[in-house]
Amino acid sequence: MSSIRAPGVYFEKVEDRLPPLGLGPTGQAGFLGLATRGPLHEPVRISSTQDFLDTYGAPLHEGFLAEAVKGFFDNGGKVCYVVRIAHTSARSPEGCAASSSATLQDRLGQPTILVQARSEGTWGNEIRVDVRTPPPAVQALLVRDISPGENFAQIRSGRGFQVGSQCRIYDGAQERYVTVNRVEGKALFWQDPIDVGFKSSAPTFIEPLSFEIEAQVPGYKERFTDLSLSPASGRYFARFINAESQLLRCVDQISPSPFPQSLPQEASRLMLEGGADGLADLTPHDFIGYNKGPGDRRGLGALEVVEDIDLIATPDLFAARELSRGRGFRSDKDVEIVHEAMITHCERLKDRFALLDLPPKAGFDRALQYRLLFDSAFAAFYYPWVVVPKEGRKRRTIPPCGHIAGVVARCDADLGVHNPPANAIVEGIVDMEMLLNDDHLGQLNHQGINCLKYAPARGIRVWGARTISSDPDWRYVNVRRIFNTMRRALEQGTQWVVFEPNGPTLWKQIHRTLHTFLEQLWLKGYFQGATASDGFYVVCDKTTNPPENIDAGILVCEIGIAPVRPAEFITFRISQHMEDRASEDSMQR
């Protein structure tokens, strides 16, 4: 209170605090590639090389994804998202990735459980399954007689019983089976009354019946005990195994046999079979994919829903060309189709940047020829391929995109998005596929190919930061990524504007918020100019919001920035629809 007043209820107007704007995380890559195992067409957050190996298994001999992800983390990357690619087709299962499986029979020979490998691939053909029905872990003594028509029992101890326990009641002369639906201390209840009576003096025992499944591959074993066929049980096999297993997923076939004949038969050394990698028939469409909504996304379409991604890379495109043996990928033209789709993906979402690889063993002329097929500010080529160490003294040549993504992430963290990711050392490589002389470096850089250069005593470094755009205003990677990062920040940070009264008060609030945000970026070196007004401007008033816009429910704020390179102003124009939202880039020379 500003002054002492008489006791009572008072109302004070407090100015709302608007959410501050800020740049979100950058340098988070989305990788599409081939792997031994792991979920297909599903983006998985990966935070280390070991995390990748735990999820996707040992590196695939024919692919480059594992080495690319390792290169990302070796060079300073912190988080990436991986989408495993394989051939999948709704039209025909032939040539498609498939999970290994085996069907368990019940005691009457009816199918009761479908056991599958956790993910598609031939890796699942090495899974061995054992099924056992062990003796009951607990046995409770009946302490009160059960009369015919009753549905409960009093026992000496309720330990080991739970909702969903499938139990045997027996006295040596007869037996019945019930599924517990309630446990109250030492009392067990079930749904259907039993048709016979049991005497506590017989004696009568009640015991839960269960089974166990053990799965193993060379070097790893897992065992699941006390499993139940009842969906009401906390140990219901399908739910429990699917949540806990690294190897299996199970499907309840719902046996028609009565319990306990519906329990699976014991099995020893049962090998899963039928797994397929789906690599020989890979097509460009497997990488491009689609986004038809939750549960129906493939390839690039699966990455659309991951908002944090701002870099994308596909290290296995040329591996797919070799694996398909001329069926799905017939030539570099098919690789070109995927590269074009990656560029379109980034241009459409407007907050991502594609890191592209040139063909392996491409000489100067071939590299230049392939690069000139594209024109976009949302992508960059890096060249040549790099040599990485393998176990022992072996080496392997791989595309550079994963290592470059890590360099970009490191530069973002250390210097900021506005600094070009160039003249930065590339960690984790021991050589390059070919060494380029200064003449080649100059010509390739001029044409928008970012080369790797060996500098004596300074290691192998990224020696360029150009996009593949023919527009000089978008020549540099950092300029495009400044806009990408700002766009994302502005779109996310101005959500509060929608449905607010469109008038001078709102315009002033927006102007203040945006000016503060841009001033902070200018102080960090994102924009040129000795003063803030030299580096950016913000206009949000009646000149950008005439009556016809207000009547149409549209709010327009105009932002101009002078990025550190090039030196011209480039206008960033944001149109806010009060019922919805839209944004656009425009240029001002």
Q: What is each of the regions a protein language model found here?
A:
Residues 166, 280-284, 307, 322:
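Bergerat-fold GHKL/Histidine-kinase-like ATPase
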Residues 100-105, 124-132, 178-181, 219-262, ...:
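Short amphipathic beta-strand/extended segments with alternating polar/hydrophobic composition
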Residues 1-107, 113-118, 170-173, 216-219, ...:
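Structured, hydrophobic secondary-structure cores that serve as assembly/anchoring elements
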Residues 250-296:
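Long, low-complexity, polar/charged, intrinsically disordered or flexibly structured peripheral segments
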Residues 137-139, 234-240, 578-589:
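Short, cationic low-complexity segments
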Residues 171-244:
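Small/polar beta-strand repeat architecture
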Residues 109-111, 159-163, 204-212, 555:
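A short, compositionally biased
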Residues 97-116, 122-197:
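Autoprocessing Asn-cyclization modules and mimics
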